[in-house]
Amino acid sequence: MANALAQLKSFTTIVADTGDIEAIKRYQPEDATTNPSLILKASQIPEYAFLIENAIEWAKTQSHSIEQQIEDAGDKLAVNIGVEILKLVPGRISTEVDARLSFDKQRSIDKAHKLIKLYKDAGIDKSRILIKLASTWEGICAAKELEQEGINCNLTLLFSFAQARACAEAGVYLISPFVGRILDWYKKDTGQDYTAETDPGVVSVTEIYNYYKQNGYNTVVMGASFRNIGEIIELAGCDRLTIGPALLEELANTDVEIIQKLVATPATQSAPAALTEEQFRWVFNEDPMAVDKLAEGIRNFAIDQGKLEVMLKTKLS
């Protein structure tokens, strides 16, 4: 019998949730995803020093302002790492817009255009890029405009059905509903332990997946943020799953039969009218877990972006 990872690949597109090139070589995923925390982690790998130096030297040619140089170097480093990863994966790389822009639609769009241009200058077509945006109302609206321009987006930090529905209604290419962080919240809130089947994160992704298929939405569902392989195995059949290196290794070393749990069924109903902004904000606000985890996720990505910029500022000085 093939290992669990090999079996999973027959049901689901496997994506590596890492900026570590060695891990990507080892597990041969279809796509890869990065975020500010992963870029910060990758920047500390000695083999990546040349990518940082290239970003620093490029930024110095773009502006005399140290603040602008720091911003430019951060963008260029994210793209440099993405370019290296694209040499190893046949599919796409997800590169994230600065989390501090999560409530600014226009600046998110502008940042996306900048990232796409940096990739283009490096010889990478936009068809291999997914622009990652937080699933705020502003992020979803930015994604809607970018999708209309032919720039595909990955809406991340997604914790609620309201966010998922709004993304589908906006015509977003892909969503990343988080599994493990939902579990974290419920374990802390209730004091309970959960099986893989009753895991609130697994239940959430399953509900979103079934809703999309039943209503004929084309938005790709990519489960993310896993705490254990039980969650992953329970979502076998999801369009895509983005998995960190430690859990990829555990799956590769696990011999257990994988059964497809999520199965796409033909659309059985027409989609409802799109949520208005007021409806979205109210329904989202009614979910305390989603409110807490979205805010926390944005804060933590912003903190790691800040740490990265401190490192870049030191090198620019």
From Swiss-Prot:
Its main location: cytoplasm. It is found in: Cytoplasm. Keywords: Cytoplasm, Pentose shunt, Schiff base, Transferase. GO terms for cellular component: cytosol. It is an enzyme of class 2 (transferase). The active site is at residue 132. It catalyses: D-sedoheptulose 7-phosphate + D-glyceraldehyde 3-phosphate = D-erythrose 4-phosphate + beta-D-fructose 6-phosphate. Pathway: Carbohydrate degradation; pentose phosphate pathway; D-glyceraldehyde 3-phosphate and beta-D-fructose 6-phosphate from D-ribose 5-phosphate and D-xylulose 5-phosphate (non-oxidative stage): step 2/3. GO terms for biological process: carbohydrate metabolic process; pentose-phosphate shunt. Signal peptide: none annotated. It comes from the Bacteria. Its EC number is 2.2.1.2. One of its GO terms (molecular function) is transaldolase activity. Homodimer. Transaldolase is important for the balance of metabolites in the pentose-phosphate pathway. Belongs to the transaldolase family. Type 1 subfamily. This is Transaldolase. The gene is tal.
